[in-house]
Design a protein with these regions (language model features):
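Conserved non-catalytic scaffold segment of RNase H-like nuclease domains
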Residues: 1-102
């Protein structure tokens, strides 16, 4: 399948501390960016959620409190993430109900 892009598109996915968009926090952000000329780039950031990651959640994605203890917070990463996605269309699975509200 060939994409006919007029601007970049960023496919993104989040791993979190749980599924409550009002309470839970991001622990990992992955972005895969495709440019109209076909070039691609990807980046994954580990994020310190500043709250404990429940063991049942770690069992799903494998990210532990220890793994993110020395990572930047979302606030500290926000400008890097913005720079990667600005001027791009966004795409993700279930993103309208979970990832974007979070």
């Amino acid at each position: 399948m060939e994409l006919k892009l007029t601007r970049p598109i960023c496919f993104f996915d989040l791993e979190t501390t749980g599924i409550d968009v009002a309470r839970d926090r991001i622990v990992e952000i992955s972005i895969f960016k495709v440019y109209p000329n076909g070039n691609k780039e990807s980046k994954t950031w580990l994020v310190n959620p500043t709250i404990p990651i429940p063991p049942q959640t770690t069992a799903v994605h494998g990210i532990t409190d220890e793994k993110v203890a020395n990572e930047p917070t979302f606030k500290e990463l926000a400008s890097q993430i913005h720079n990667m996605i600005k001027d791009s269309d966004l795409a993700g699975f279930n993103s309208d109900r979970f990832d974007i509200p979070l």
